[in-house]
UniProtKB/Swiss-Prot annotation:
The active site is at 20 (proton acceptor). Its EC number is 3.1.1.29. It is an enzyme of class 3 (hydrolase). One of its GO terms (biological process) is rescue of stalled ribosome. One of its GO terms (molecular function) is tRNA binding. Keywords: Cytoplasm, Hydrolase, RNA-binding, tRNA-binding. This is Peptidyl-tRNA hydrolase. TRNA binds at residues 15, 66, 68, 114. The keyword Nuclease does not apply. Belongs to the PTH family. It is found in: Cytoplasm. The record marks 93 as: Stabilizes the basic form of H active site to accept a proton. Monomer.
C-alpha cells in the first residue's frame, strides 16, 4: 500500500512560512521527523520525499505548480501509482477558521480555496481526506491575497506551530490506524 500526504503551498523562498504555506510547513515537519529529504520531480511537478511505516510507503508531497495548479501534481501522482482517492490526504490553510484551529474532513467543496478547487477539477471528486488549518480572516481592510501571502505575526506563529504539532499527531494516528473516520472522531473534538 501507498499513501500520498500532500501539503499545499507556493514554492520558493518568497513564500516560506506564509499563511498560505501551512500545508508545506506540516509536510516539512513530517519529513524532518522521518529524517528524509525532498527531491524535485519535474514529471510530477512536485518535491517528493518518502519513507516506510508499517509496511506502507508514504510519500510526502509539495506541489511546485503554485497553489492554483496543485491538482496537476496530485492527479499525476495518483495516476502514476494507481492509487485510490482513499490513499490521499491533503493538508492546507483555511481562511474561515480562526488561527490555529484544525478540522479533518472526508469530503467538501473548495470553499473558495483555489488549490482545493484545482484538485477537485483534476481528480473529478470532492470526496477526499483533508486536514484544514485555520489562518483566520484578513484584518484592517487587508485584501485576502495579501493576507494569505503574508507571514504570521509572533502570537499567531506560536499558535500555528502548536497546530502543526497537533496535525502531525493526527496524521501519524491516521497512518497507524488506517481509518480516517476514526482519526476525525479523535481530533475534531
Amino acid at each position: 500500500m501507498t499513501k500520498l500526504l500532500v501539503g499545499l503551498g507556493n514554492p520558493g523562498d518568497k513564500y516560506f512560512e506564509t499563511k498560505h504555506n501551512v500545508g508545506f510547513m506540516l509536510i516539512d515537519q513530517l519529513a524532518k521527523k522521518q529524517n528524509v529529504t525532498f527531491t524535485h520531480d519535474k514529471i510530477f511537478q512536485a518535491d517528493l520525499a518518502s519513507f516506510f511505516l508499517n509496511g506502507e510507503k508514504i510519500y510526502l508531497v509539495k506541489p511546485t505548480t503554485f497553489m492554483n495548479e496543485s491538482g496537476k501534481a496530485v492527479h499525476a501522482l495518483l495516476t502514476y501509482y494507481g492509487l485510490d482517492i482513499d490513499d490521499l490526504l491533503i493538508i492546507y490553510d483555511d481562511l474561515d477558521m480562526e488561527v490555529g484551529k484544525i478540522r479533518l474532513r472526508a469530503k467538501g467543496s473548495a470553499g473558495g480555496h483555489n488549490g482545493i478547487k484545482s484538485i477537485i477539477q483534476h481528480i473529478g471528486t470532492q470526496v477526499f481526506n483533508r486536514v484544514k488549518i485555520g489562518i483566520g480572516r484578513p484584518k484592517n481592510g487587508m485584501s485576502v491575497v495579501h493576507h494569505v501571502l503574508s507571514k504570521f505575526d509572533r502570537d499567531d506563529y506560536i499558535g500555528i506551530l502548536q497546530s502543526i504539532d497537533k496535525v502531525d499527531d493526527s496524521v501519524n494516528y491516521y497512518l497507524q490506524e488506517k481509518k480516517f473516520e476514526k482519526t476525525m472522531q479523535r481530533y475534531n473534538g
